[in-house]
């Protein structure tokens, strides 16, 4: 048995080593377009290892210093990318959406987040209706309706998860709160156990989403793939059940984002199917899981480190 395993290992190495050497030594075919300075790293691995080892800040600062403070090229998750830095880069990106640039995600990320039949569909088509919904739910009139819910959930969360303890992990608890709030506002889900059925696999997705895209058992990326399958399975059940509820009782429409997504029609009068709705919901949940949680964590960190700012915020809260 040991001889067989050893022979199998030698066979695999004999096949993989020449392929790796070929990828390492071949001359890439570049087009005539001028590319920014930088390095795309190792074949397949790209610069994922350096990114994971040093963290985002160190990784970006080193390359800004070495190559350019405005833009540099690198390779993440099997994709060659350009990283824009500073105000000029941000202005260019955000003022040229659907003009000079378009929304895009690496294929490895799409594979973890979307249904298989949508992995190769342009992101513009996958989230075609999301922008109109975002504008709708972020309008001042809409935000007024959310504030009582957000306030009540925040108080309940602080009483249960913060008050009983002398020390807490802010980032972890911020993610727990913002994800539960997203489930409440987007899906009208309040049951903690139901939220947990979505949060646990979603955490696996986020933990492996930016890892090296090797889909082998035991890798972080494989965990992201499995977590994504579970999230989509759970969301599909929620969407299907909500559709049945709306058929039986149309008066329940409009109480949350999901209900409006089910009923909205595109320019051709066509409704979104269940998988399209799930894809859009996943995009919103991704934003709620990390981005908002990071903002909350840094706000609390700065208030702790700057007591004079904290005092002004506190006094302002008392006035309100």
Segments the model singles out, each with a brief description of its role:
Residues 1-18, 75-82, 140-152, 161-184, ...:
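Cytochrome P450
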Residues 2-116, 125, 129, 144, ...:
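N-terminal membrane-proximal hinge/A-helix region immediately C-terminal to the signal-anchor transmembrane segment
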Residues 31-37, 51-53, 120-123, 138-145, ...:
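Conserved, non-catalytic sequence blocks in retroelement Pol enzymes and Pol-derived host proteins
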Residues 42-51, 207-226:
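Alpha-helical membrane-targeting segments
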Residues 84-87, 157, 185-186, 238-239, ...:
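Hydrophobic, repeat-rich solenoid/adaptor surfaces of innate immune receptors and signaling proteins
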Residues 114-123, 185-189:
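Helix-loop "lid/cap" segments that line or gate small-molecule binding pockets
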Residues 139-142, 227-296:
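Conserved cytochrome P450 catalytic core segment spanning the I/J/K helices
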Residues 291-310, 314-316:
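Cytochrome P450 catalytic-core helices
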């Amino acid at each position: 048995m040991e001889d067989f395993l050893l022979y199998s290992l030698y066979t695999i190495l004999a096949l993989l080593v020449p392929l790796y050497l070929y990828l390492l030594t071949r001359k890439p075919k570049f087009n005539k377009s001028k590319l920014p300075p930088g390095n795309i790293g190792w074949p397949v691995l790209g610069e994922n290892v350096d990114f994971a080892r040093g963290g985002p800040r160190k990784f970006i600062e080193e390359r800004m210093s070495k190559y350019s403070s405005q833009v540099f090229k690198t390779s993440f998750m099997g994709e060659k990318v350009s990283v824009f830095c500073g105000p000029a880069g941000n202005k260019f990106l955000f003022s040229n959406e659907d003009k000079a640039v378009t929304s895009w995600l690496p294929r490895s990320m799409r594979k973890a987040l979307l249904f298989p039949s949508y992995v190769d569909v342009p992101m513009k088509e996958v989230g075609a209706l999301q922008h109109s919904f975002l504008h709708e739910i972020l309008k001042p009139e809409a935000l007024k309706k959310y504030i009582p819910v957000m306030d009540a959930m925040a108080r309940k969360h602080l009483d249960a998860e913060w008050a009983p303890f002398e020390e807490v992990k802010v980032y972890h608890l911020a993610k727990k709160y913002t994800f539960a709030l997203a489930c409440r506002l987007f899906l009208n889900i309040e049951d903690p156990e139901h939220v947990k059925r979505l949060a646990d696999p979603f955490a696996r997705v986020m933990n492996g989403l930016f890892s090296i895209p090797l889909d082998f058992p035991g890798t972080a990326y494989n965990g992201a793939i499995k977590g994504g399958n579970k999230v989509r399975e759970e969301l599909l059940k929620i969407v299907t059940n909500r559709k049945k509820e709306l058929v039986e009782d149309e008066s329940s429409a409009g109480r949350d984002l999901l209900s409006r997504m089910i009923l909205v029609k595109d320019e051709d009068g066509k409704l979104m199917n269940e998988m399209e709705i799930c894809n859009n919901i996943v995009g919103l949940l991704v934003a709620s899981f990390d981005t908002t949680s990071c903002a909350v964590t840094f706000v609390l960190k700065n208030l702790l480190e700057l007591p004079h700012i904290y005092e002004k915020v506190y006094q302002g809260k008392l006035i309100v």
